[in-house]
Every structure is written in structure tokens, then in C-alpha cells.
């Protein structure tokens, strides 16, 4: 592990020089101490869903086109920047010292740049709960996979941030990548711009691929742990496997209903 840690420090100096804004005060101690607040946030989120749908039941839908464009555009830019910074770090580590270093050791927490973006990543999971408000206020179908995914991702991100789950680097990196495409699509759709017809299917396919890769990383984590070569726990493996497994089933089911079933259409996961 010392080798991987030393390498990550060297990598930061050679390839990941932080910008001034990325040297912001480290707020990890605060977030780690209050990570259980994510459960309260999720409870409030679920209650607001019930209240919001009840309130809108007898009212006309709101257009919210401009706010939705700005909302999606902001999250798209944020995700793209996070993708560029995180993929550069993870890919360099993987191709230099091997995949095991990125799966078994939380080396990403030792890098100032990644530390900054992981902090923002956690906060973004709270912000993204606002997606649901647009669905409710515009009276679009709110499907199970949407609110289940939003709420559990926040909980798991908080859990991983608190416990420095080794495979969390890939969880964050893949999520940034998928969201950079997804929110770009949502921006184009809200602005009524032309986009490839296959783009929604591509996004769902990327989401499914993310779950498959996440499950593979979890299995590798478990195998290498048996060799006493991974700094992980049974609890880490269990929750990672459970969440990736349920996400895979839900997104695969959505893909089948939306794109493979001959008749009938399903509303976009987060319109």
C-alpha cells in the first residue's frame, strides 16, 4: 500500500496539479462526522415527493422550461468537469500500477484534486434530488427507479465517503461520466434542440454498463480481499453488491420496457 500511496502523491505532482479553487479548505472531517444526516435528507425527500404529488394532483402542471434548461446545463458542466479530473487520475493509476491499486486501496482520498471533487460529488447527490421536483411540478410520470436511485445513491455516497470505501473512486468516476452525457441530453431536450434518436438508449446502456462494471469491481475486491491484499470489509462488499445488483435489475427492466417491448412507451427516467 505504501507504494500505491507514494505513487499517488507523485501522480498529483506530475499530472494533477490543483487549480487554486481546488485547494479549498478540506471539509471531510465535517462531512464524515455528520454523514448520518443523509438519512434525514432522504426521509425529507421521500415525504416531499408524497406532499408534492398530492399538491399537484388537482393543479395544472408548470412549464419550467427555462429553469430546467439552466438546471440541466449546470449539472452537465459540473459532471463534465468532474469526469475530466477523475478519469485522468483513475486511468493513470490503473495503467501505471494496475487495476488492483484502484479497487483495493483508497488512494484517491490522498490526492488534493480528487479530494476536492469527491467532496463536490457528495454534495451533488443532494442537489440532484431537485430533479424530482421538476418531474412532480411538470406532472411527469415518476417511476420507481428514479426516486430509488436518487435516494440510495446519496446514502451509499455518504457511507463510502465516511468509510473511504476503496472502490469508491470508480463509483464516483463512472457516475460522473454517465451524468455528463445524461444531463447534456436533458439540457438539449429541455431546450428542444435536435439530438440523436438513439441517445436515450445509449444513456440507459451506459447506466447498465456502469452497474456491470461496479459489480465486477466488487467481485474483484472480494477475491483480492481473500488474499489479504485489499483494504475493504465484508460490509463494504455487501452494500456495494446489493446496490449495484438492484440498479442493474431496475435499469435493465427499464431498458426492456422503453426500447425493446414492441408496444407502449415508458417515460424518460428523469424528464
Curated annotation (Swiss-Prot):
Q: Which domain of life, per UniProt?
A: Eukaryota
Q: In which pathway does it act?
A: Lipid metabolism; polyunsaturated fatty acid biosynthesis
UniProt's post-translational modification comment states:
N-Glycosylated.
What is catalysed by this protein? a very-long-chain acyl-CoA + malonyl-CoA + H(+) = a very-long-chain 3-oxoacyl-CoA + CO2 + CoA; eicosanoyl-CoA + malonyl-CoA + H(+) = 3-oxodocosanoyl-CoA + CO2 + CoA; hexadecanoyl-CoA + malonyl-CoA + H(+) = 3-oxooctadecanoyl-CoA + CO2 + CoA; octadecanoyl-CoA + malonyl-CoA + H(+) = 3-oxoeicosanoyl-CoA + CO2 + CoA
According to its UniProt record, this protein's enzyme class is: transferase
Q: What is this protein called?
A: Very long chain fatty acid elongase 3
Q: Topology versus the membrane, per the UniProt entry?
A: Multi-pass membrane protein
Q: Which family does it belong to?
A: Belongs to the ELO family. ELOVL3 subfamily.
Which example biological process does GO assign this protein?
unsaturated fatty acid biosynthetic process
According to its record, what are the GO cellular component terms?
Answer: endoplasmic reticulum; endoplasmic reticulum membrane
**Residues linked to a glycan:** 6
Kindly list the GO molecular function terms attached to this UniProt entry.
Answer: fatty acid elongase activity
User: Which residue spans traverse the membrane?
Assistant: 30-50, 67-87, 116-136, 141-161, 165-187, 199-219, 236-256
- State the protein's purpose: Catalyzes the first and rate-limiting reaction of the four reactions that constitute the long-chain fatty acids elongation cycle. This endoplasmic reticulum-bound enzymatic process allows the addition of 2 carbons to the chain of long- and very long-chain fatty acids (VLCFAs) per cycle. Condensing enzyme that exhibits activity toward saturated and unsaturated acyl-CoA substrates with higher activity toward C18 acyl-CoAs, especially C18:0 acyl-CoAs.
Localization annotation: Endoplasmic reticulum membrane
Q: What species is this protein from?
A: Mus musculus (Mouse)
KO phenotype (gene knockout): Mutant mice grow normally and are fertile. They display a sparse hair coat, a hyperplastic pilosebaceous system and their hair lipid content is disturbed with exceptionally high levels of eicosenoic acid (20:1). In the triglyceride fraction, fatty acids longer than 20 carbon atoms are almost undetectable. As a result, mice exhibited a severe defect in water repulsion and increased trans-epidermal water loss. When exposed to cold stress, mutants exhibit a significantly reduced VLCFA elongation activity in brown adipose tissue, but only during the initial phase.
Amino acid at each position: 500500500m505504501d507504494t500505491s500511496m507514494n505513487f499517488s502523491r507523485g501522480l498529483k505532482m506530475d499530472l494533477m496539479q490543483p487549480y487554486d479553487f481546488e485547494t479549498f479548505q478540506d471539509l471531510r472531517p465535517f462531512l464524515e462526522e455528520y454523514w448520518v444526516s443523509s438519512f434525514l435528507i432522504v426521509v425529507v425527500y421521500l415525504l416531499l415527493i408524497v406532499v408534492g404529488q398530492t399538491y399537484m394532483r388537482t393543479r395544472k402542471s408548470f412549464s419550467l422550461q427555462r429553469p430546467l434548461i439552466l438546471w440541466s446545463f449546470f449539472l452537465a458542466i459540473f459532471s463534465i468537469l468532474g469526469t475530466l479530473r477523475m478519469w485522468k487520475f483513475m486511468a493513470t493509476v490503473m495503467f501505471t500500477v494496475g487495476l488492483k491499486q484502484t479497487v483495493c486501496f483508497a488512494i484517491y482520498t490522498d490526492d488534493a484534486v480528487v479530494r476536492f471533487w469527491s467532496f463536490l460529488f457528495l454534495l451533488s447527490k443532494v442537489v440532484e434530488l431537485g430533479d424530482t421536483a421538476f418531474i412532480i411540478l411538470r406532472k411527469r410520470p415518476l417511476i420507481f427507479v428514479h426516486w430509488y436511485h436518487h435516494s440510495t445513491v446519496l446514502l451509499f455516497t455518504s457511507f463510502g465517503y465516511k468509510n473511504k470505501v476503496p472502490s469508491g473512486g470508480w463509483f464516483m468516476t463512472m457516475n460522473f461520466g454517465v451524468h455528463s452525457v445524461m444531463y447534456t441530453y436533458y439540457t438539449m431536450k429541455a431546450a428542444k434542440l435536435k439530438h440523436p434518436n438513439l441517445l436515450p438508449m445509449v444513456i440507459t446502456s451506459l447506466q447498465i454498463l456502469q452497474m456491470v462494471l461496479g459489480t465486477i469491481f466488487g467481485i474483484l475486491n472480494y477475491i483480492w480481499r481473500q488474499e489479504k491484499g485489499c483494504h475493504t470489509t465484508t460490509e463494504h462488499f455487501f452494500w456495494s453488491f446489493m446496490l449495484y445488483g438492484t440498479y442493474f435489475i431496475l435499469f435493465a427492466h427499464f431498458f426492456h420496457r422503453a426500447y425493446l417491448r414492441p408496444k407502449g412507451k415508458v417515460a424518460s427516467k428523469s424528464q
